[in-house]
């Protein structure tokens, strides 16, 4: 591909560190999980995700995103999401989630698998949005 280097799909002169800084600075809540580890734990989250959920990195890393679920989280949507992730497929939907302080928010999420060259899922990347105002209408 013209303008790309190292076969990694990065434009010439753009480093992984540049992407990491951009993701960290983004106002869009983002999280990465590792399905190769037991219970698919969070391995990275940006500042916007921490602000949305109220968790600090050390409280979140190593834990499954289930910690955002609560008694009013829709079990049917969860089942659909989990089936997609088990199959290595993308998922898009909304869930009622719970912040660390127990308050609820509607979480609109898009989850995509990140694969290696052989097609194996290495990570799941999720971009999220607070959809609470939409649900108040």
Task: Give names to the regions the model predicted.
Residues 2-6, 21, 25-28, 35, 90, 120-133:
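PAS-family sensory domains
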Residues 13-23, 98:
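Short alpha-helical capping/linker elements at sensor-output junctions, especially the PAS-family N-cap
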Residues 29, 43, 91-96, 101-110, ...:
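PAS/PAC sensory module
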Residues 32-41:
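Short acidic/glycine-rich beta-turn/loop cap or linker motifs at sensory/regulatory domain boundaries
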